[in-house]
């Protein structure tokens, strides 16, 4: 019987991570294949009803958030994170206001829907903006430690 | 990467297995390091140096090719 134990060897840990990556790639291909099949046979609605769609979107969002850490590390500008935060917040408020406003137009005056949609867009945009701010702030602090 | 681990290990009378147990890795990893086929982390390099009573540069230092040519 194979004895299962915690891996302590750094080389095997790395190998293990590489194996997980391979499995993840295959799994994603499988999920995409199933979703593509659903799309062809049942149309877009049938595809999005599949719980695998939720899994796919969730992992895509998580991987996008995790890769933000890498994008921030790539930035080499000295600009302050506060300025970036203010600019992105201003743009976000403008965009969510526009979307909310556009939604109130239409056949009937639909103020509630406009507020809800604008609010959802605002919150969805706010989370990544705050996360990027936090990452930039962190890398800025680490940078200033060096000097 | 080339290194002097094998010589240092034999000098202190350790087998690959014994060294592996001392530093907490598998024998295969030690073997791959000796052959220069695995690039260990600095942490593992230090552990190995402590185990064979050598300094980092005695085991892992290699001169730059251009410096070698300049010396000759």
Language-model segment annotations:
Chain B
Residues 8, 40, 66-69:
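Short linear/disordered segments characteristic of secreted peptide precursors
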Residues 3-22:
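Short basic helix-loop element that most often maps to the first helix and adjoining turn
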Residues 25-38:
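Recognition helix of helix-turn-helix/homeodomain-like DNA-binding domains
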Residues 24, 43-58:
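DNA major-groove recognition helix of helix-turn-helix/homeodomain DNA-binding modules
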Residues 1, 19-20, 26, 50:
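Short N-terminal alpha-helical targeting/association segments
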Residues 3, 13-14, 40-43, 54:
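Residue-level signal for the short linker/turn that defines the boundary of a DNA-recognition helix
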Residues 60-72:
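Short, charged recognition helix plus adjacent turn
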């Amino acid at each position: 019987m194979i004895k299962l134990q915690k891996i302590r060897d750094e080389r095997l840990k790395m190998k293990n991570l590489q194996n997980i990556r391979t499995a993840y790639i295959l799994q994603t291909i499988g999920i995409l294949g199933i979703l593509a099949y659903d799309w062809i046979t049942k149309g877009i609605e049938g595809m999005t009803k599949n719980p695998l769609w939720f899994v796919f979107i969730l992992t895509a969002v998580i991987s996008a958030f995790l890769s933000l850490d890498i994008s921030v590390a790539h930035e080499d500008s000295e600009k302050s994170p506060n300025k970036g935060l203010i600019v992105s917040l201003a743009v976000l408020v403008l965009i969510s206001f526009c979307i909310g406003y556009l939604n109130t137009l239409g056949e009937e005056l639909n103020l509630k829907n406009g507020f809800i949609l604008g609010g959802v867009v605002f919150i969805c945009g706010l989370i990544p903006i705050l996360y990027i701010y936090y990452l930039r702030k962190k890398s800025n602090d680490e940078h200033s430690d060096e000097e | 990467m080339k290194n002097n681990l094998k010589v240092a290990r034999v000098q202190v009378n350790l087998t690959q297995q014994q060294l592996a147990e001392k530093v907490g890795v598998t024998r295969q990893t030690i073997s791959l390091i000796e052959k220069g086929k695995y690039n260990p982390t600095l942490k593992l390099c230090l552990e190995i140096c402590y185990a064979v009573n050598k300094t980092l540069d005695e085991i892992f230092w290699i001169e730059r090719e251009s410096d070698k040519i300049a010396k000759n």
